[in-house]
Amino acid sequence: MEIRVFQQSDFEEVILLWEHCDLLRPWNDPEMDIERKLNHDPELFLVAEVSGAIVGSVMGGYDGHRGSAYYLGVHPDFRGRGFANALISRLEKKLIARGCPKLNIMVREDNDAVIGMYEKLDYETQDTIMLGKRLIVDQEY
């Protein structure tokens, strides 16, 4: 497995990966999400590759106060082999190198498997409520 920064040639394969991982939602246009990411800290958009095929991804961010991770996904055929841990670990190292003191991760409330994975990596559930507001309406995907 190789973990590397996303490249433009990965575009379609990453979207297909996200479909396999059930990460896409009708209100998010994955193509726009990738384009936006490529304009802001593209070196924090990582993919895991095995034999030339992309099998995992994570999209990280850092605003100078806290880091974030989105679109963490590993193809179902490659789960349970440490790919997600490796992607998060690499993102953590990149964020630490920038002086980032904390990484916040959003997980759907009913995603027990992913919550358990993060807990094994010493992440803790926070007593906060996340609020959101759509500022730009993407086309439905």
Swiss-Prot record:
<dbReference type="InterPro" id="IPR016181">
    <property type="entry name" value="Acyl_CoA_acyltransferase"/>
</dbReference>
<dbReference type="Pfam" id="PF00583">
    <property type="entry name" value="Acetyltransf_1"/>
</dbReference>
<feature type="domain" description="N-acetyltransferase">
    <location>
        <begin position="1"/>
        <end position="141"/>
    </location>
</feature>
<comment type="similarity">
    <text>Belongs to the acetyltransferase family. YpeA subfamily.</text>
</comment>
<keyword id="KW-0012">Acyltransferase</keyword>
<dbReference type="GO" id="GO:0016747">
    <property type="term" value="F:acyltransferase activity, transferring groups other than amino-acyl groups"/>
</dbReference>
<dbReference type="InterPro" id="IPR000182">
    <property type="entry name" value="GNAT_dom"/>
</dbReference>
<dbReference type="InterPro" id="IPR023072">
    <property type="entry name" value="Acetyltransferase_YpeA"/>
</dbReference>
<protein>
    <recommendedName>
        <fullName>Acetyltransferase YE1169</fullName>
        <ecNumber>2.3.1.-</ecNumber>
    </recommendedName>
</protein>
<keyword id="KW-0808">Transferase</keyword>
